[in-house]
């Protein structure tokens, strides 16, 4: 299934496009955004990092139908990218996101996660959503808790910041739909 446009009360989630790379390159390479990303992301972020990510990783995965990528934009400024969220068929890593620091702690990512999680379960018909995170990433944990996810595994993992305690969070379609209706 192609990545659809999604909308919440305050946000537009637009399917990622090649032309988004320029804006992403300008806002993404900030320590507060990258520190808890998996160690595979290049850091320091190269000048063509966003272009390579969008054109060599994200868009090909979207074309294959194994991942879905959106830019996050406020309705008040729909031309400005404030974050990114993706879903993937990758084992134990189904959802990832980042938000520009100045827009954090306003509920935007909770809102974006809610609509893409519903898409995962009720449009893509997946049975379970799993999201890994660094144990110290309290904001991400709060989003998972708010969504009704539960911690299912702990361990160590390499992040850009280094080797950190890591957690794997999960929610099933049945759990999601039960709480979403309730």
Question: Which role fits each region the language model picked out?
Answer:
Residues 1-35, 69-182:
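Acyl-donor (CoA/ACP) binding surface of acyl/acetyltransferases
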Residues 18, 45-47, 63, 104:
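A generic alpha-helix propensity feature with a strong bias for hydrophobic helices
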Residues 42, 63-65, 162-164:
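Short coil/turn motifs at beta-sheet boundaries
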